[in-house]
Amino acid sequence: MEDNQIELITRMVLNVLQEKQSGKTGFAVPVGVSARHLHLTQDHVEQLFGKGYELTKKKDLMGGQFAANETVTIVGLKLRAIENVRILGPVRKASQVEVSATDAIKLGVKIPIRESGNIKGSAPIAVVGPKGAIYLDEGCIIAKRHIHMSPTDASTAGVKDGDIVSVKVDDERETVFHQVQIRVDSSFTLEMHIDTDEANAAKITCGQIVTIL
């Protein structure tokens, strides 16, 4: 056997061993980039838009959610504001505002990184609509990056709900995201969700494919 053939085979074997040691699954996932948005209770919708008001649908999203036509302005403690923040429906039991770290700097608010729905002790924020305003003592977070999966996808990838994985972006910036949470539900479509800061840092666009390590 020629020396170059031996070298090639050796390299291939080493690559396989390295992948096994790192626990690489090779499972491919498309990326969705989430811009700042918020979820509201029906009571808060009415305080912002008027009594009896209901959100109107702009675009369907996964899991029965939708992007609403309605937008609001969010205001930090130093009266720094960000306008045209889109509401996602349907209404929830608790209102929640999700922003990026860059948004947090602009708002002048120290905002924790949290899983969606985990708002206890999170940052305060004011929300202003065309008919009124509300003040949330807590509810503003930077959403923890995560992957939505169906049970079938999770089984194929060898992961379960709540698992934490690392994900590699194979582009010119060769980025690896750690601390990516797996979220499994039968209503979910396979997609990794990151915010605009994370997407810009890794030069990722919506629909780009990444790989679970």
From Swiss-Prot:
It is found in: Bacterial microcompartment. GO terms for molecular function: acyltransferase activity, transferring groups other than amino-acyl groups; metal ion binding. CoA binds at V33, S34, A35, K78, R86, N200. It is an enzyme of class 2 (transferase). Keywords: Acyltransferase, Bacterial microcompartment, Metal-binding, Transferase, Zinc. Pathway: Polyol metabolism; 1,2-propanediol degradation. InterPro entries: PTAC (IPR008300). Phosphate binds at R92. There are 2 Zn(2+) ions per monomer; Zn(2+) and CoA bind inbetween the 2 domains in each monomer. One of its GO terms (cellular component) is bacterial microcompartment. Disulfide bonds: none annotated. It comes from the Bacteria. Zn(2+) 2 binds at H146, H148, H193. Its main location: other. Involved in 1,2-propanediol (1,2-PD) utilization within the bacterial microcompartment (BMC) dedicated to 1,2-PD degradation by catalyzing the conversion of propanoyl-CoA to propanoyl-phosphate. This is Phosphate propanoyltransferase. It comes from Lachnoclostridium phytofermentans (strain ATCC 700394 / DSM 18823 / ISDg) (Clostridium phytofermentans). The gene is pduL.
